Amino acid sequence: MSTVVVKGNVNGGVQQPRRRRRQSLRRRANRVQPVVMVTASGQPRRRRRRRGGNRRSRRTGVPRGRGSSETFVFTKDNLMGNSQGSFTFGPSLSDCPAFKDGILKAYHEYKITSILLQFVSEASSTSSGSIAYELDPHCKVSSLQSYVNKFQITKGGAKTYQARMINGVEWHDSSEDQCRILWKGNGKSSDTAGSFRVTIRVALQNPK
């Protein structure tokens, strides 16, 4: 008879704690489900992809092949104490064929944005004299007018010109010269002076 009493109280008090446990587990499962089902990590990944796409579009916003920037280096060797001459920067720059006969002919417009003029001394310690130099930003003079700036032939030196000083802010037609540097030595014709080393940075646009 004891077994009959146990089975007869299923709706009484014997099975009821198990129901409460199951109900409690369901409530806990329901509380956990929002955390499991909300996949918030997917949204930041989509935003990162969009930012990455924006960065790529900025890098490719300017079409390639429409402009170029180049650096050229050339030298003027075997200068004597009384040597004189000039560098005309543009299509007349015969001392730098790679620029004059090369890339300059491939573009309609250019501008030289900086010029580094270096004098490398090769003179003996007993030599005397200097080499004066002058910037003509508009190619208006053909001979040295000023002797203010000088390189001592026994020491050497360097001078840098930026774009605003050399008429290099605006674009120039590739058939026109931009500026000129003139120089003249006051030493002896028998004395070895040295050489010039010139570095120019050039921007080009509108290819032919």
UniProtKB/Swiss-Prot annotation:
One of its GO terms (cellular component) is T=3 icosahedral viral capsid. Residues 1-16 have a biased composition (Low complexity). Residues 1-69 are annotated as: Disordered. It holds the Pfam family Luteo_coat. Its main location: virion. The keyword Cell membrane does not apply. Residues 17-30, 44-61 have a biased composition (Basic residues). It comes from the Viruses. Keywords: Capsid protein, T=3 icosahedral capsid protein, Virion. It is found in: Virion. One of its GO terms (molecular function) is structural molecule activity. The N-terminus like those of many plant virus capsid proteins is highly basic. These regions may be involved in protein-RNA interaction. Major capsid protein that self-assembles to form an icosahedral capsid with a T=3 symmetry, about 23 nm in diameter, and consisting of 180 capsid proteins monomers. Most of the 180 monomers are the major capsid protein, but a small percentage contain the minor capsid protein, which has a long C-terminal extension. Belongs to the luteoviruses capsid protein family. This is Major capsid protein. It comes from Potato leafroll virus (PLrV).
